[in-house]
Amino acid sequence: MSTVEPNAYDPQQVETSAQQFWDATRAFQVDENSDKPKFYCLSMLPYPSGALHMGHVRNYTISDVVSRYKRMTGHNVLQPMGWDAFGLPAENAAIKNKTAPAKWTYANIEHMRAQLKSLGYAIDWSREFATCTPDYYVHEQRMFTRLMRKGLAYRRNAVVNWDPIDQTVLANEQVIDGRGWRSGALVEKREIPQWFLRITDYAQELLDGLDQLDGWPDSVKTMQRNWIGRSEGLEIQFDVRDTTGAALDPLRVFTTRPDTLMGVTFVSIAAEHPLAQHAAKSNPELASMLETLKHGGVSEAELETQEKRGMATGLTAVHPISGEEVPVWVANFVLMGYGTGAVMAVPGHDQRDFEFANKYGLPIVQVVKLREPRNDDEQAWDATQWRDWYTDKSRELELINSAEFDGLDYHGAFEALAERFERKGQGQRRINYRLRDWGVSRQRYWGCPIPVIYCAKCGAVPVPEDQLPVVLPENVEFAGTGSPIKTDPTWRQTTCPECGGPAERETDTFDTFMESSWYVARYTSPNARDMVDRRANYWMPADLYVGGIEHAILHLMYFRFYHKLMRDARLVDSDEPVTNLLTQGMVIAETFYRDADNGGKDWINPADVEIQRDERGRVVGASLIADGQPVHIGGTEKMSKSKNNGVDPQAMVAKYGADTVRLFSMFAAPPEQSLEWNEAGVDGMARFMRRLWVQVHKHVGEGAAALDVASLSAEQKAIRRKTHETIGKVDDDYGRRHSFNTAIAAVMELSNALAKFDDASAQGRAVRQEALEAMVLLLNPITPHASHALWQVLGRGETLLENVPFPQVDAAGAGA
């Protein structure tokens, strides 16, 4: 039985009592032996950085609200938690704190688990795991060896973003303005051996599958469609000659605009293209240029903004229609990793080619015109001024200056050229994708070892399954200059499993997106001997996944791909891992700073600032509490360490209680929108919690009575109608709309109406009892600790409220 004091609302006492009850009864531990419909709800698993931030709190509270609501509506609910524990931050912390990454990681997990428990989340902790343990990563090692045997995992040299400080490969998204996202070092291009998974084999299925994901935001699906980037075009062959006229290997280029072929005035190739390397052997100036371009970006986004640079190679390409020779140029906006590393340059109808041609004085030819120009600007064509219609394929176009193809539109030209090239063996129709195979190698220590052995005789050999896991040594001295396993001969040196000769282990580790690509399935059967067992097909696909939209094209793409690999390995039956996706907005807060001596800014935490606001709550002045002197107001931005505007959830829970923090995080904004942290708003939620506490205790002190609907007065009927209208709205807000802020507002309105209802008669008290019981249950998904206590105060006994049915609308009551 609860030991909560009857009158004063003490959040710490209330929350400790509820949490002890949940722990003692294993309230949220679930299994598959239920006749209830299943509901699998989870948030993206956290990285154990050392402390929760408000973004975590918002994310996990959303999941918890839905999970508790679903259990109250008769579902068998799984809400698990684990730790995405490998990764570069642990290595950096190990260097800074002079400790092993493993020790730092496990200590952080202990601390963050306690923080999560203090917030009262309805988590099945029996399924917890950390992805850095051999019990977890042995399964992805086994899967990788199977993918190797099927040809879905392979090794090749690849041009990568190389961070010379962190000594690792960076994804394109980790390169910001040409520098490493973490170290700030100038990124280089390097060609090194890398392991890849053939995600491109699944490109069309990944694209088609988006049409079935009705529960995913359109914005995420659009981002994935664009990232996959399906395009239909022609692959065309250009013969190549050197400076002596001798034939070299031909170039094959892919284009979605074959209608502009007669406008080709040069061909552009990537700096890493074999023809560029060949030409550089006899051209020192070109060789120097290629070396310079190593520091350029390798992402399309970077190439759109950086200055166009290039150099003629001295080679020429033969136009496949006219037979004319056009120069071959190296250009910094052509990527070796996209298509063939060569593009046909049509400066009259491609803006990048246009800018490049104007810079270097190359010919520009118009070969397409609009059939129905809308104005003089569209009638004119100027080789010195770019106009968007030059490349607008959506308009009615007509070929000009294109020999026998003059007068054709886009589709007519496409078909005519495709037929010609296929007949002559000079090209073919082709579907191309922007999506590249997933490079999974990382030159780091703190990651899952790639289970491969290199033998001089046998080559790359997968580690036999009976020798898995390949365990990463955890008790290491880590200085940050390279990886400890690379310099440890006892770990690195081994014998070849095929010939028994001397061999060496792969010292690269997996990209940490590998671990987060299948963990959702592992929660369903965390103690299975294989990757998953039959329980996966009970729970999968997950019903709701909550996380940030910033993961749309990396984690969520790999996540879908890996699930299909598991399906094809007959580990799961479903095609997709998640049915519904909720992408919550950021948590933002005000920023304050003083100018630093070095010309920068010293950011000051809002907790250290005295803020003056106008009558509308806007900041009009601010001063540092420590010295009373003014500070600059920096605007409202995402909570971050760099802006020092984060709020410590632990401090907020200690000051206000977990329920109040949960309540504010759900009330301040709809889930998909940014939430502005405002402690005045938190204080307002605390006042509401105290008012509700007093409201219930005052009512109980007056005594209860049985409800007799037939004898209710008009005022009593009005309160009862308000109660049942609120039940209907909150039920819809929780279940269909995920609009938690309006659900809270509706309960507050009912509370206010009840506060004005001072009928102390027996039926007045009965109507009030029904309303208060409904309010306690309606708030339970958001404020479960207080609801747990107030349910007892209302005389209903100590029980798990998630097993109490969610209130139902009484049609007669709603229309009373």
UniProtKB/Swiss-Prot annotation:
Its EC number is 6.1.1.4. It is found in: Cytoplasm. ATP binds at K641. It comes from the Bacteria. One of its GO terms (cellular component) is cytosol. GO terms for biological process: leucyl-tRNA aminoacylation. Transmembrane segments: none annotated. A motif ('HIGH' region) lies at residues 46-56. A motif ('KMSKS' region) lies at residues 638-642. Keywords: Aminoacyl-tRNA synthetase, ATP-binding, Cytoplasm, Ligase, Nucleotide-binding, Protein biosynthesis. The keyword Cytoplasm applies. Belongs to the class-I aminoacyl-tRNA synthetase family. This is Leucine--tRNA ligase. It comes from Xanthomonas campestris pv. campestris (strain ATCC 33913 / DSM 3586 / NCPPB 528 / LMG 568 / P 25).
